[in-house]
Amino acid sequence: MSGAAFSRQRGQLLSDTLAAAKAEGRSALIAYLPAGFPTVDGGIAAIKAVFDGGADVVEVGLPHSDPVLDGPVIQTADDIALRGGVRIADVMRTVREAHEATGKPVLVMTYWNPIDRYGVERFTAELAEAGGAGCILPDLPVQESALWREHAEKHGLATVFVVAPSSKDARLAEITAAGSGFVYAASLMGVTGTRASVGEQAQDLVRRTRATTDLPVCVGLGVSNATQAAEVAGFADGVIVGSAFVKLMLDAEDEAAGLEAVRALAGELAKGVRGGD
């Protein structure tokens, strides 16, 4: 089977997974973990653990030396991964092994600069061959995304763009028209990290975004427990959780304890997106 044909199944798997959650009357649980943290093997084990706990989709972060949109927790994890020598090849391996072990959709979340340096065709081809479902590109402007989208579509990869409360309605329509898979709605202005409340802005942003697209709208940036997950699940198609998982691994006594902690949190959040059932 060709890489492109293989990946089209993976891109469809993402859409099917989100649709299946909706058919069950719930939001999807989407987890974020950086590749190479605490090690490449440890990162793969952590992804398997959150899938075991009940995550529907995982975003694999490509560690960056200047993650300007990420808070201190993810910055710390990225720094550990980079000091460990993580490379794009390790990210691809993480995607491949996580997907092959679970059969679940796995995306990459990355800033644009590493892809630009690596080569768009090379990156998309390798991600497709690894079984990746697509890519989340938080800092790639839609008006500069034509080359990426050409190659992503060629390889059957979803392109997920990020919208924010500051986005005007016309801008939302432009962003959602260019994207695929789902829309990532940033629930609070600023960088990622757990917060006491995900904020009322999130619900309004989801409403405004849905007015422009039939794509699922998934909310991230702030959710860290089942109560918040249930709150967001009441109005969003997916609940994205990252910093809370990473913090548990940073705070754990050892890797085994970290794996158990993220598995347990995924289970708690999975109950949250199901309304506590």
UniProtKB/Swiss-Prot annotation:
UniProt EC number: 4.2.1.20
Q: Which PROSITE patterns match?
A: TRP_SYNTHASE_ALPHA (PS00167)
The record's active-site residues are 59, 70
Q: From which domain of life does this come?
A: Bacteria
UniProt KW Amino-acid biosynthesis keyword: yes
- Tell me the function of this protein: The alpha subunit is responsible for the aldol cleavage of indoleglycerol phosphate to indole and glyceraldehyde 3-phosphate.
Q: Which family does it belong to?
A: Belongs to the TrpA family.
Instruction: Report the PANTHER family cross-referenced here.
Output: TRYPTOPHAN SYNTHASE ALPHA CHAIN, CHLOROPLASTIC (PTHR43406:SF1), TRYPTOPHAN SYNTHASE, ALPHA CHAIN (PTHR43406)
Which NCBIfam families did the record assign?
Answer: trpA
- The molecule here is called Tryptophan synthase alpha chain
Question: What is the organism of origin for this protein?
Answer: Streptomyces avermitilis (strain ATCC 31267 / DSM 46492 / JCM 5070 / NBRC 14893 / NCIMB 12804 / NRRL 8165 / MA-4680)
Q: Upper lineage ranks? A: Bacteria, Bacillati, Actinomycetota, Actinomycetes, Kitasatosporales
